[in-house]
């Protein structure tokens, strides 16, 4: 079959190959055509660098596929840059390259202006004037690229283990967006995350600005152990609302959830269970409210007592 090999200069080479050919064989064919020694060749397909011992069929390279040929500079090295979207960019660099140089290479590949790039390695943000060797970044190291959005801000998320995560966010980001960023960094599924700020649990559909979360604010991350539960809230009109809660949720949290669903301000809500009015600071487990329990909602009229 025929495949194409595109070089960084834009030249396209056509090769006759078999699916069973190894990458090593392909590099030998390129040497025959172009005179480039195999040890200076790097072949990329679908964003992956191809390994010498594997075959074209291992990588699902079919007829008329296009490989990309990158020259491995003597003394140069490859590093990877992973974005928050999960895309991995491969760069050819020298240990003596500055972070500024690396950002320029990323701009060449991806079109992202250097002033919007933040590069992270081993949990540290890298400074423009320092070099890769200053940070002990070696061949095949992976850097993380975070975009510094215009008008964006940094916030911190502290876990129960005491670890602090730094996030780049916008005031207009929803709590759902923030949980997705935490998943990208830490691998924790959003449905297991509960975020707390100023003592309140944050609801997915609301934004950071709704909660007056500003730059360098610290949120607290509590893991929602599988074992969240559903409860029902019945109003005097006979309507039943379903809520997702934790036994550790306070009555105040529950009223906030009702407000999000129904628009009723918490100060107008009275919740009754087993004949008792529930107090804001107590938790569902304090009242032995279990999954599929039904609470009753009575409206406290303005001026009422």
Curated annotation (Swiss-Prot):
Task: Kindly give the Gene3D superfamilies that the UniProt entry links to this protein.
Answer: Phosphatidylinositol 3-kinase Catalytic Subunit, Chain A, domain 1 (3.10.20.90)
Which PANTHER family does this chain map to? UBIQUITIN (PTHR10666)
Residues with PTM ADP-ribosylglycine: 76
Pfam families from the entry? ubiquitin
Query: Outcome of altering residue 65 to A?
Result: Non-phosphorylatable. Reduced phosphorylation of human PRKN by an insect Pink1
- Propeptide span(s): 305
| Protein name (database record) | Polyubiquitin-B
Q: Which gene encodes it?
A: UBB
In this chain, where does the modification Phosphoserine occur? 65, 141
What the entry lists under CDD domains is as follows:
Ubl_ubiquitin
The UniProt entry, under SMART domains, shows: UBQ
Q: How does it assemble?
A: Interacts with SKP1-KMD2A and SKP1-KMD2B complexes.
């Amino acid at each position: 079959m025929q495949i194409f090999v595109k070089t960084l200069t834009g030249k396209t080479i056509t090769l006759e190959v078999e699916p069973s050919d190894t990458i090593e064989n392909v590099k030998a064919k390129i040497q025959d055509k172009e005179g480039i020694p195999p040890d200076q060749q790097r072949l990329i397909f679908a964003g992956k660098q191809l390994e010498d011992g594997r075959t074209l069929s291992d990588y699902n390279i079919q007829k008329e596929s296009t490989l990309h040929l990158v020259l491995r500079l003597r003394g140069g090295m490859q590093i990877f840059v992973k974005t928050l979207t999960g895309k991995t960019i491969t760069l050819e660099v020298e240990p003596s390259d500055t972070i500024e140089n690396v950002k320029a290479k990323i701009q060449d590949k991806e079109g992202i202006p250097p002033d919007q790039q933040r590069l992270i390695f081993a949990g540290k943000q890298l400074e423009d004037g320092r070099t890769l060797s200053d940070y002990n970044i070696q061949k095949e190291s992976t850097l993380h690229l975070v975009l510094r959005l215009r008008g964006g801000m940094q916030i911190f998320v502290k876990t129960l283990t005491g670890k602090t995560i730094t996030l780049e966010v916008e005031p207009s980001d929803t709590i759902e967006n923030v949980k997705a960023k935490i998943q990208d960094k830490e691998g924790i599924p959003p449905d297991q995350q509960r975020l707390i700020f100023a003592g309140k649990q944050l609801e997915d559909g609301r934004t950071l600005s709704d909660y007056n979360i500003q730059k360098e604010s610290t949120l607290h991350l509590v893991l929602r152990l599988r074992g969240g539960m559903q409860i029902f809230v019945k109003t005097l009109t006979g309507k039943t609302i379903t809520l997702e809660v934790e036994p550790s949720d306070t009555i105040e949290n529950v009223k906030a959830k009702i407000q999000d669903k129904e628009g009723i301000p918490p100060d107008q809500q009275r919740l009754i269970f087993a004949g008792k009015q529930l107090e804001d600071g107590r938790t569902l487990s304090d009242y032995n409210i279990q999954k599929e329990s039904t609470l009753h909602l009575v409206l406290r009229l303005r001026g009422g007592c």
